Amino acid sequence: MTQDHPPVLFVGAGPGDPELITVKGQKALARADLVIYAGSLVPEAVLQWTPASARILNSAGMTLAEIVTEMENAWLEGQQVVRLHTGDPSLYGAIFEQMAKLSQRQIPYTVIPGVTAAFAAAAALKVEYTLPEVSQTLILTRMAGRTPVPETESLENLAAHRATM
């Protein structure tokens, strides 16, 4: 492993409003040589902080292997790689597979969290998810899609906890 190369950065782009990207995420984009983002999910306006010299790839049509190869090749050249995900990359961000592939190649990486849509929604609606003597627990879940939801995590089972959902 080349120690002087910067780590690959997994950056949360926030919930869609370009002004809700974190300062740390914005700074990461500002020094990026390669940005790989999901064009179907991340608005192009979030890329406004990326230097004109940066290479920008839309991952919508790319396989996991292609994404990892692009990240590896750029990292081996000493470039700053940013993998831009919606919201917070650690929540439904599908970064586990990418991190595992980078670890196999001994490529360091760092995760820069982002604002998740759940909390942006609470702010927009002016609501609080936890209230004294009402609920001190928040459960985040999603509907089944390409990835199924385990039966033990059905809405009925989760609602039995009487927590905020």
Give the role of each language-model region.
Residues 1-115, 120:
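Class I S-adenosyl-L-methionine
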Residues 2-8, 76, 81, 109, ...:
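Beta-strand/loop-alpha-helix module characteristic of Rossmann-like adenine-cofactor folds
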